[in-house]
Amino acid sequence: MSRKVTVIGAGNVGATIAYTLSLGDIASQIVVVDINKEKVEGEVMDIVQGTSFREPISVIAGDYSDAADSDIVIITSGIGRKPGQSRIDLAQTNVNIMKDIAPKIAAVAPNALYVIVSNPVDIMTYVFTKVSGIPENQV
């Protein structure tokens, strides 16, 4: 099977999703994108070393151009909720992050199926759909 999956965000959730994908037969290529290049490179090295006995799979720390023609894109980017922080305060910070990501990934992977994992999920999904122009049936 040849399926390309991109994970945007190499934090705890994104790195765990990328690792889990690397263990199964869901993807033949996994691209992990994060604004923190050192973090994403370290996470990808861990994944590659932890899956060395699996069938050949390509796992790379990349950028949006590497995500071109992805079949599935999973967006996990965002700031975690801090103690005492309201859902609205969290939403505003993460909306700004989503507004930056959405047009970049939509430009290179317009036919992908998108999974939004960033919190608050309902708001982030709405923002992604509006900013990216990706049809709702792909999100």
What are these regions (language model features)?
Residues S2-V5:
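Extreme N-terminal starter segment of soluble prokaryotic enzymes
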Residues A10-G11:
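Glycine-rich Rossmann-fold phosphate-binding loop(s) that bind the pyrophosphate
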Residues G14-A15:
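N-terminal Rossmann-fold NAD(P) dinucleotide-binding loop
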Residues L23-Q29, G133-E136:
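Conserved S-adenosyl-L-methionine
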Residues V33-S70:
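Conserved N-terminal Rossmann-fold NAD(P) cofactor-binding segment
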Residues S77-I79:
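Conserved NAD(P)H cofactor-binding loop of Rossmann-fold oxidoreductase domains
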Residues S86-V139:
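Rossmann-like NAD(P)(H) cofactor-binding subdomain of soluble oxidoreductases
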